[in-house]
């Protein structure tokens, strides 16, 4: 199973499969055998000879594959062997129809998978019903064989002997019911194996046949096959009498050895109870149990019954054990009980009852080891049933949660009143002592001692009532109070979680602001240097502009002065200068 892969009822090996071939197998695995990849593109003459040769080489080089498929309308397992040359027989033949088949294969495969899931669910439900019906029939035939065995044993002891035709007819009837029971058990386990295959997706029934399952099937068949066979067979039975210790030898029937183990068939009752239980048949309960990892077995059903109706279960079990053990002791002791003490059914019931209750008066003692073994098992069962009865009675006498809560509330109210009364008595006696010692002219010492005595009694009463109140508060920690405490703790934890989330948000905001501030601080030297450079550049530009203005002003001034000089040197002389 570890090296195979299950998909839609087909077990395929994972080795020697390429991705394209695996996809092809998954597309059409329910209705068709697996096809090699060379046949998918086989469109008449559309493919080239080189491609066909390469595909044929790929098919011939791949290892043979054994595919186990389960059709929807066939319960048998089909084996198909595909190897070299399989492409020609299964290849696509229709000219250019390969692309159309590839486009429609996806929807077909999805429909087939959905149909396969629905078929499996319906098949599983049918197997459940068949298994339940087989278990019912097996219980009917098993109980029928036990009843006929008891009738035959009683009639052969008092009415006729083992060699009569009546005994032979009844034994043949027991054998027939046993054969039918064995057939039903085999078919039941076959249904179990089919359910295992459906649940685990296996196609080979041999996968479910583990050594443990084989052992339990063989053990069940062996237990149910034991029955008194037709015919008269005897053996010599030697025992020692209880009170006289004298040996007793008699000829006994082999049927007594084969009849008593037939009561082991009663295990079928537990199986029927399991299969008819609402916890086992209800899908919702099984789903919840699977989520909680609970096994729905006979033990769980018995625990549920002991929780729901413990008294009824113990009563039915005790009475059934009492009757069966009494008849078994009677059957074991009838050959060596000469005084008809334990071989009498009422006497055997008395012996079983005093053994079951662990009393043991000693007035009746079994003679054979068979009777002693039955009494031993009865004593063990009685001890267990007594413990269960004590537990059930204690649980029935215990107060419920609501009753405990009401009782604690009433006791707390009464203790509160007693505390108030005791405190009032203390105050009253204190006032009376003060009055009789300070507010009177003549002190009455007897009255003062009386009030002092009452004062001390009131103090002790107040202390005892407060102690009872503390004990009640300690005992009041029931599941209801624990639930309240749990709710309070849940609210506190929720509040703390909300505060922690708010605190985390604030921390995240603070971290964001700190990161922004750190980024600004890291960018500050660059901004400062850039600002200083800009200011220096502006200052230098301003200085250069003022210098240029000064230079131009000086140049213009020198030009104007030179012009004046030139004009004065080139001007004609006036009349005053000439005279």
Swiss-Prot record:
An annotated GO BP: potassium ion transmembrane transport
GO terms of molecular function: alpha-actinin binding; calcium-activated potassium channel activity; calmodulin binding; inward rectifier potassium channel activity; protein domain specific binding; protein homodimerization activity; small conductance calcium-activated potassium channel activity
Chain's role: Small conductance calcium-activated potassium channel that mediates the voltage-independent transmembrane transfer of potassium across the cell membrane through a constitutive interaction with calmodulin which binds the intracellular calcium allowing its opening. The current is characterized by a voltage-independent activation, an intracellular calcium concentration increase-dependent activation and a single-channel conductance of about 3 picosiemens.
Cross-referenced SMART domains: CaMBD (SM01053)
Primary location recorded for the protein, binned into one broad class: membrane
Keyword Phosphoprotein in record: yes
Tissue specificity statement from the Swiss-Prot or TrEMBL entry: Expressed in atrial myocytes (at protein level). Widely expressed.
InterPro entries: CaM-bd_dom, CaM-bd_dom_sf, K_chnl_Ca-activ_SK, K_chnl_dom
Residues that span the membrane, as ranges: 138-158, 168-188, 214-234, 256-276, 305-325, 374-394
Name of this chain's protein: Small conductance calcium-activated potassium channel protein 2
Gene this chain is encoded by: KCNN2
Intramembrane bits: 345-365
Biological classification of the source: Eukaryota, Metazoa, Chordata, Craniata, Vertebrata
Annotated spans, Calmodulin-binding: 412-488
Effect upon mutating residue 371 to E: In DYT34; uncertain significance
């Amino acid at each position: 199973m570890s090296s195979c892969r299950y998909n839609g009822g087909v077990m395929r090996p994972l080795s020697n499969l390429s991705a394209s071939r695996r996809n092809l197998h998954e597309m059409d695995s329910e209705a068709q055998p697996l096809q090699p990849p060379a046949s998918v593109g086989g469109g008449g003459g559309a493919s080239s000879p080189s491609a066909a040769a390469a595909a044929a080489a790929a098919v011939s080089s791949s290892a043979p594959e054994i595919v186990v498929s389960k059709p929807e309308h066939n319960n048998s397992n089909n084996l198909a062997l595909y190897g070299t040359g399989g492409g020609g027989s299964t290849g696509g033949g229709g000219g250019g129809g390969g692309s159309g088949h590839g486009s429609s294969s996806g929807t077909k495969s999805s429909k087939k998978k959905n149909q396969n899931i629905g078929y499996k669910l319906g098949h599983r439900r049918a197997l459940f019903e068949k298994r339940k019906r087989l278990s019912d029939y097996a219980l009917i035939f098993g109980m029928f064989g036990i009843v006929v065995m008891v009738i035959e044993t009683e009639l052969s002891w008092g009415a006729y002997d083992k060699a009569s035709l009546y005994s032979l007819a009844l034994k043949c009837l027991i054998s027939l019911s046993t054969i039918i029971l064995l057939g039903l058990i085999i078919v039941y386990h076959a249904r179990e194996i089919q359910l295992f295959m459906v649940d685990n997706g296996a196609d080979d029934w041999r996968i479910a046949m583990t050594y443990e399952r084989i052992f339990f099937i063989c053990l069940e068949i062996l237990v149910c096959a034991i029955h008194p066979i037709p015919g008269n067979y005897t053996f010599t039975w030697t025992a020692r009498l209880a009170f006289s210790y004298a040996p007793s030898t008699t000829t006994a029937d082999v049927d007594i050895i084969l009849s008593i183990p037939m009561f082991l068939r009663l295990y079928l009752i537990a199986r029927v109870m399991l299969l008819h239980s609402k916890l086992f048949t209800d899908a919702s309960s099984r789903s919840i149990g699977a989520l909680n990892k609970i096994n729905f077995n006979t033990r769980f059903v018995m625990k549920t019954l002991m929780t729901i109706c413990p008294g009824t279960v113990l009563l039915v079990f005790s009475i059934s054990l009492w009757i069966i053990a009494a008849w078994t002791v009677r059957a074991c002791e009838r050959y060596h009980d000469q005084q008809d003490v334990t071989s009498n059914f009422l006497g055997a019931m008395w012996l079983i009852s005093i053994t079951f209750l662990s009393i043991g008066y000693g007035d009746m003692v079994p003679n054979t080891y068979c009777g002693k073994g039955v009494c031993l098992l009865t004593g063990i069962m009685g001890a267990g049933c007594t413990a269960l009865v004590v537990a059930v009675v204690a649980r029935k006498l215990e107060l419920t949660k609501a009753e405990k809560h009401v009782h604690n509330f009433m006791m707390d109210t009464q203790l509160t009143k007693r505390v108030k009364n005791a405190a009032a008595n203390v105050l009253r006696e204190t006032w009376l002592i003060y009055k009789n010692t300070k507010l009177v002219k003549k002190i009455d010492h007897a009255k003062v001692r009386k009030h002092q005595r009452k004062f001390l009694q009131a103090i002790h009463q107040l202390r005892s009532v407060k102690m009872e109140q503390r004990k009640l508060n300690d005992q009041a920690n029931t599941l209801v109070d624990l639930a309240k405490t749990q709710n309070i703790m849940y609210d506190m934890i929720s509040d703390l979680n909300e505060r922690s989330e708010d605190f985390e948000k604030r921390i995240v905001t603070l971290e964001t602001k700190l990161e922004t501030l750190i980024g600004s601080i890291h960018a500050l030297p660059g901004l400062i240097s850039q600002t200083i450079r800009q200011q220096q550049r502006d200052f230098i530009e301003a200085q250069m502009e003022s210098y240029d203005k000064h230079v131009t002003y000086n140049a213009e001034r020198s030009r104007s002065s030179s012009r004046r000089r030139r004009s004065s040197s080139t001007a004609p002389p006036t009349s005053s200068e000439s005279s």
